[in-house]
């Protein structure tokens, strides 16, 4: 593998080797990242990247689409089966583009969109002012209860009835608790709004039956196909409404995209098949068990877990008790081979570029085969680094850094990722 690349472009080849080593010998704890199977990557790197296929199966604007039509049909059917829905569009290039298409299929620019505040656990595309969603729509943002740090459904209802949004968005990128979609739908119906659920972060948990299926209540469900779903980087739109499905299709193409990425759609089909296996269900159970163990261990060491714990694959850690910023923590951990991301916390006092917390997720380390025992070790390593941060650049004493680096590498070597699967 990569032999042709090595000959043609040794610079890119060498950079790929560097990234392979980072993934192989580092602890990946970014909640939105995971490791795709070799089968998924083979589909991604296939000859399908050569094929243009504007339009939809049996209704293309290019010839020669016999085989890609079958591939897209297969991906759509598998998505429908996996998430128990009537309709699926597998063409969105990303979760953000899936959200854009979803919004524009049921609303017009200038309409009111209500979503969760980014600093409370939402996502850029849920109405952040710097994002298209905040520029195209009039945005109302809800948050979490300041005491429980969980969604305040009474506040959501009150705001929805007051502002009468066209769209209510549920879902988030840093919210660790199970969301009550039934309650959201009741609020949406009362306010005369469409309910869009962005399940990008927890789609794998939904597929495994370990998280409520939002398709039972939402007018539209959007998702990415990576993260907990463990597929290629891409987007997905689901619905049970025939008219909405027609509008979604028109909004994806030609509304917001041109040709679909057929190599990515093939990889999506592979990942949907993988997600229908019994092994995938066991994997997702372990993802949650690992997250709960890691959160409990960090809490026992004196760190504060936002909302007091997690129901899912991720947790938000408040670093205020250690007087360390998220920025410094991210840098310090990365120096030791542990990757997380700085993250704002509810009622944040710092800028998003500094932040008071870090977001941690367990999908990637669980993919490697790690379990509760390893989570306890990882918690020890994280705490050892965080309690020794010296400055805002994330510097820590050299001997601490060396010891943690060695421990991280040793742990990763016990759970090999790609070295035994990819021939370099």
UniProtKB/Swiss-Prot annotation:
Pathway, per record: One-carbon metabolism; tetrahydrofolate interconversion; Amino-acid biosynthesis; glycine biosynthesis; glycine from L-serine: step 1/1
GO biological process: glycine biosynthetic process from serine; tetrahydrofolate interconversion
Reactions listed under catalytic activity: (6R)-5,10-methylene-5,6,7,8-tetrahydrofolate + glycine + H2O = (6S)-5,6,7,8-tetrahydrofolate + L-serine
Binding positions ((6S)-5,6,7,8-tetrahydrofolate): 118, 122-124, 351-353
Gene Ontology molecular function, alphabetical: glycine hydroxymethyltransferase activity; pyridoxal phosphate binding
PROSITE patterns, A to Z: SHMT
UniProt subcellular location: Cytoplasm
Record flagged with keyword Cytoplasm: yes
Assigned protein family: Belongs to the SHMT family.
Subunit structure: Homodimer.
Full protein name: Serine hydroxymethyltransferase
Originating organism: Pseudothermotoga lettingae (strain ATCC BAA-301 / DSM 14385 / NBRC 107922 / TMO)
